[in-house]
Each structure stands twice: as C-alpha cells, then as structure tokens.
C-alpha cells in the first residue's frame, strides 16, 4: 500500500495550483448556469487523485462524487485561469 503524504506537502507544492471544494448544491447549480454547461460537460477528477485525498484529509471529510473542485492557476503569460472539475469515482 502506498504511503500517504502530509496534505500540506501536496497542497502547498509549487506545481500544484490552488484547489477549492464546492459541495453546496445551490452554489454548484449557480456555477453551472453561469458557465452554461451541465456537470457531465466538465472535466473529471477522481476521488483517489492525490489532491482530492489531501483536501479530504485537510477538511476532515470525504469529498463526495458530484462535488466540484475549483482550480485557480496563476501564469506569468496567461494570467489567472479558473477551471472546474467534477469529482467522480475512479473507473473499476
């Protein structure tokens, strides 16, 4: 079995952009409406992704499938980019 890393090591790594969990259904619906998409249109992030595991440990609760993860990337060339991914179970 793989050794678990300290969530702060994962979440504060220089190559890992800021991730924020959104699990409030009203907020999710508002975001989807603003983007003009359905949940199924968003890219996915699995519940076993190292960042999702670290966020779960940091928040003290399991991040459930159907939640959104807001990812904010800062780039010297592209500026600030915000993307959303929907949490899903990994394929079996």
From Swiss-Prot:
What the protein does comes down to: DNA-dependent RNA polymerase (RNAP) catalyzes the transcription of DNA into RNA using the four ribonucleoside triphosphates as substrates.
The organism's superkingdom is given as Archaea
Q: Where in the cell is it found?
A: Cytoplasm
Query: Which protein are we looking at?
Result: DNA-directed RNA polymerase subunit Rpo5
> Which Pfam families does the record match to this protein?
RNA_pol_Rpb5_C (PF01191)
Q: Look up the EC number in the record and give it.
A: 2.7.7.6
- Give the NCBIfam families listed for this entry: PRK09570.1
The record's keywords, sorted A to Z, are:
Cytoplasm, DNA-directed RNA polymerase, Nucleotidyltransferase, Transcription, Transferase
The entry assigns this protein to a family as follows: Belongs to the archaeal Rpo5/eukaryotic RPB5 RNA polymerase subunit family.
Source organism per entry reads Methanopyrus kandleri (strain AV19 / DSM 6324 / JCM 9639 / NBRC 100938)
Q: Name which cysteines form disulfide bonds.
A: none
Name the predominant localization: cytoplasm
Q: Which GO terms describe its molecular function?
A: DNA binding; DNA-directed RNA polymerase activity
Give the first-level EC class, as a single word. transferase
HAMAP family reported in the protein's UniProt record: RNApol_Rpo5_RPB5 (MF_00025)
Recorded catalytic reaction(s): these are: RNA(n) + a ribonucleoside 5'-triphosphate = RNA(n+1) + diphosphate
Q: Name one GO cellular component term.
A: cytoplasm
> Self-association or partners: how does it assemble?
Part of the RNA polymerase complex.
List this protein's GO terms for biological process. Answer: DNA-templated transcription
């Amino acid at each position: 079995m793989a050794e678990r890393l300290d969530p702060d090591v994962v979440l504060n790594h220089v190559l890992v952009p800021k991730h924020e969990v959104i699990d409030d259904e009203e907020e999710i619906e508002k975001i989807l409406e603003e983007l003009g998409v359905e949940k199924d249109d968003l890219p996915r992030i699995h519940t076993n992704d190292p960042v999702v595991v670290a966020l779960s440990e940091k928040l003290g609760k399991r991040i459930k499938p159907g939640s959104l993860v807001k990812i904010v990337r800062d780039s010297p060339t592209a500026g600030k980019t915000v993307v959303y991914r929907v949490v899903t179970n990994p394929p079996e």
